[in-house]
Amino acid sequence: MRLLDGRSMAADIGRSVVDDVERLATTGVTPTLAVVLPTADEAARSYVRVIERGAAKVGVGCAVHELTGDPDELTATVDRLAADPAVHGMIVQTPLPDGLTAADVGARIPVGKDVDGMNPLSLGRLALGLPAFAPATAAAVLEILNRAAVPLAGARACVIGRSSVVGKPAALLLLAEDATVTVCHSRTKDLATVAHDADIVVAAVGRPKMVGAGHVRPGAVVIDVGTNWTDAGLVGDVDADAVAPVAGALTPVPGGVGPVTTMLLLRNTVRAAGG
């Protein structure tokens, strides 16, 4: 079984990002990412610290805006950053204040600055095959598969999870690579049987160790998007101990999709700045 090391892939991406940042610096541009923290949520703050560390490594500016949980303050902040030419990329962390949805907030982010694919227009453009930033986690799934040289054209892919953040955009990205995609969810009957037919299994349901050996055909590639905190620590949606003897390749948790996601956010910011 091949372990798909997201940390080493992220480091490779980071080196190319540094090159692009240095090239932009010759034109007087510093790619800058604005991160909005709408509420005092510790999990969100923890992730933002990861983004800040990554940005510092590659030379991307990162401005964090910590808010009080007031909906009007959030929309005003997003509108101000959207109009600021010094801001090239924007992300808004969840949870959001009561009364606001991700679609409400995302619609206020210009598509050109929407480096995490939060604007519904970005998802629509993705569905139509038009240029747009995909949600970084979904893009990380494809990045890992491509870097691991996993054949996608004609492959059978099973995406377990249908969120607009991971499942749906990951399915669209796989379709764009000519994979044959099945999207499963909580109402899917005989999930294990459906998943077992796939060459590629993407687990993105937010349920610890839900995907077991019975879901995976011998030699299949398994991408574990899950990040679940349990008494035993951080675990994915895949029971890695059970699946590893069966799978041909598997992303670890931690150290798989997460590091690639962070670096893609920064790469998107550089691209939004003209890099």
Curated annotation (Swiss-Prot):
InterPro entries: Aminoacid_DH-like_N_sf, NAD(P)-bd_dom_sf, THF_DH/CycHdrlase, THF_DH/CycHdrlase_cat_dom, THF_DH/CycHdrlase_NAD-bd_dom. One of its GO terms (biological process) is L-histidine biosynthetic process. Keywords: Amino-acid biosynthesis, Histidine biosynthesis, Hydrolase, Methionine biosynthesis, Multifunctional enzyme, NADP, One-carbon metabolism, Oxidoreductase, Purine biosynthesis. GO terms for molecular function: methenyltetrahydrofolate cyclohydrolase activity; methylenetetrahydrofolate dehydrogenase (NADP+) activity. The keyword Amino-acid biosynthesis applies. Its EC number is 1.5.1.5, 3.5.4.9. GO terms for cellular component: cytosol. It catalyses: (6R)-5,10-methylene-5,6,7,8-tetrahydrofolate + NADP(+) = (6R)-5,10-methenyltetrahydrofolate + NADPH; (6R)-5,10-methenyltetrahydrofolate + H2O = (6R)-10-formyltetrahydrofolate + H(+). The keyword Lipoprotein does not apply. Signal peptide: none annotated. Transmembrane segments: none annotated. Pathway: One-carbon metabolism; tetrahydrofolate interconversion. NADP(+) binds at G161, R162, S163, S186, T227. HAMAP family: THF_DHG_CYH. PANTHER family: C-1-TETRAHYDROFOLATE SYNTHASE, CYTOPLASMIC, C-1-TETRAHYDROFOLATE SYNTHASE, CYTOPLASMIC-RELATED. Catalyzes the oxidation of 5,10-methylenetetrahydrofolate to 5,10-methenyltetrahydrofolate and then the hydrolysis of 5,10-methenyltetrahydrofolate to 10-formyltetrahydrofolate. Homodimer. Belongs to the tetrahydrofolate dehydrogenase/cyclohydrolase family. This is Bifunctional protein FolD. It comes from Parafrankia sp. (strain EAN1pec).
